Amino acid sequence: MAKLSKRMRVIREKVDGTKEYSINEAIALLKELATAKFVESVDVAVNLGIDARKSDQNVRGATVLPHGTGREVRVAVFTQGANAEAAKAAGAELVGMDDLADLVKKGEMNFDVVIASPDAMRVVGQLGQILGPRGLMPNPKVGTVTPNVAEAVKNAKAGQVRYRNDKNGIIHTTLGKVSFNEVQLKENLEALLVALKKAKPSSAKGVFIKKVSISTTMGAGVAVDQASLEAQA
């Protein structure tokens, strides 16, 4: 059996894997154990009471976290005319149509989010094999195909997170940075849970939000007692 690193031994000693911690305890524990030489992200895993094999029970969407994610987000927008000017004014780094598609085809993708107006999908549709595997393909379900591209750019810049359950019915996304204070991380988590509950499929029965765990980039998951959150399931 491989020897545990000193860091993992400390985590094992500090984190009780059988316990659910209050949100404030959980955040304090993450901060105590975040000893990496960079500012770690705080991520969340939410186990949903869905059957991910059924397409009508899959959960997908986006929400703006009240305190953002702590990341600088670069946005590319496929649009034209007045929408192009509006996208630039809203802060988009790259705006275009065929010229932007040519950059993507060359592999020049210096952006984190892609937004498109409906009239641009004829161009974007040709890029599915490039953008799709990278999770960058615009989709109306998460607000990245929209006639109001300026608002979508502002949301992306403000700290919008997109979420989609995996094959096990678990949502993975980010809540911010370990440098955020407890209130910021707690309110970001509560905002995400509110959005998830609004996205609950009508065919999903029983408890919808079954388990919530938070972790840092290099740390172990810490289960959160939902009773300590204002947005209880």
Swiss-Prot record:
Keywords: Repressor, Ribonucleoprotein, Ribosomal protein, RNA-binding, rRNA-binding, Translation regulation, tRNA-binding. CDD domains: Ribosomal_L1. InterPro entries: Ribosom_uL1_bac-type, Ribosomal_uL1, Ribosomal_uL1-like, Ribosomal_uL1/biogenesis, Ribosomal_uL1_3-a/b-sand, Ribosomal_uL1_CS. One of its GO terms (cellular component) is cytosolic large ribosomal subunit. GO terms for molecular function: rRNA binding; structural constituent of ribosome; tRNA binding. It holds the Pfam family Ribosomal_L1. It comes from the Bacteria. SUPFAM superfamilies: Ribosomal protein L1. One of its GO terms (biological process) is translation. Belongs to the universal ribosomal protein uL1 family. Part of the 50S ribosomal subunit. Binds directly to 23S rRNA. The L1 stalk is quite mobile in the ribosome, and is involved in E site tRNA release. This is Large ribosomal subunit protein uL1. The lineage of its organism: Bacteria, Pseudomonadati, Pseudomonadota, Gammaproteobacteria, Aeromonadales. The gene is rplA.
